[in-house]
Amino acid sequence: MSRIEISTESLDLPLVHAFTIARSSETVARTTIVRALWNGLEGLGETAPSARYDESVESARAAIAAHPLGDDPYALENAFDGLPPAARCGLDIAFHDLIGKDCERPLYQLFGLDPGKTPVTSFTIGIAPISEMIAKVREVGTHPIIKIKLGKGAEIETIGAIRDIYTGTIRVDANEGWTPEQSVTLLRELARFDIEFCEQPIPAGTPERLRWIR
């Protein structure tokens, strides 16, 4: 059995629209491709480290390069011990891709999953002037679920304008941009627009305050 050879490549992907949330904005998405070579097969993984969690493309690549991996992609339980999350993510995906190719089966079959029962994810709309957000929603077309980033003001006006043109499921995400008091006030007002849920309304690490909102 041959040793697993790992290589990584950084990609800077220009975004069609600036992606703005309550705490940051970006026009380029930085991601890392992970390639795992083993027994003539290539497994591909990807990871997108976040500065919010003290990780970067550079730190993820360095962690992957320094980590011993052995010669068995099936030895998943202990393979990634000690790795930070972004590096672990990229390697985990690459190893699973290797396993699927080695077994000549798609992963959903190896996991015993029914593709027809796959949950539909949301399409995310970043913060922008309301007219721009409306245009982005129109670009989405008939996608059944959208997630709207909030947290910089004009929340009620924004969601009201979007609900006027969009009949699907709406989720909102404040990315820690509100206080508990603001959260209660805004969520009560937003309820009339049939919002499925609100993600991360207040700063992380304060579960007792989140409990108070609930």
What are these regions (language model features)?
Residues 99-123:
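Catalytic pocket of metal/acid-base enzymes, prominently hydrolases
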Residues 2-3, 8-10, 24, 36-103:
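Metal- or metallocofactor-binding catalytic centers and their adjacent structured scaffolds
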Residues 13-20:
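Short Pro/Gly-enriched beta-strand edge/turn motifs at strand-loop
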Residues 3-11, 120-127:
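Short amphipathic
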Residues 43-45, 119-125, 144-148, 170-174, ...:
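Hydrophobic faces of well-ordered beta-strands that scaffold small-molecule active sites
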Residues 148, 153-214:
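Catalytic core of soluble alpha/beta enzymes
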Residues 127-140, 153, 181-186:
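Short, acidic/polar
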